[in-house]
Amino acid sequence: LETEYDASTFDTDPFEPQPQGCRTIFPFFVANQNRGGAPGYVELPYTLPQDSTLYLLLGERTPDIWLRKLDWIVQRGGLALVNIHPDYMDFERSDYAAFRYPASHVEDLLDYVSTRYRDEFWNPLPKELAAWFRASCLPARPHPPGGAAKLP
């Protein structure tokens, strides 16, 4: 793939076909195993349970699982990334309907992050996080002949 990043892997998710996930709360580099093309991409794992699993499948009534997992991730210096489906949110009522959950749960998560972790987090776009990871976390490579640097 000619892509800079991917965000389709979960750290763990017992409700997915591969429940073990990638087993990390940190971004990582996936090298291209083929010759030619892009050198690889940065994987940004989802580390918070997706909304549809929590509220529609498990029937959770509060964002407490998100908040507890977020605190656990912060203690370890990891990436907090959640998959949210606006089409499952109920923006008009505060109760649960078939295949809908209150949008206030997402608001509560965002309020919690901005209050509890004020000035302690970075909220980049995925492409910005992937670029930072490539520049800051991958080992430096010697420049190829001609002086042009290539990504690892």
Locations of the language-model features?
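C-terminal domain-boundary segment and adjacent tail
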Residues: P63-P152
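Active-site-adjacent pocket scaffolds in enzyme catalytic domains
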Residues: L1-G78
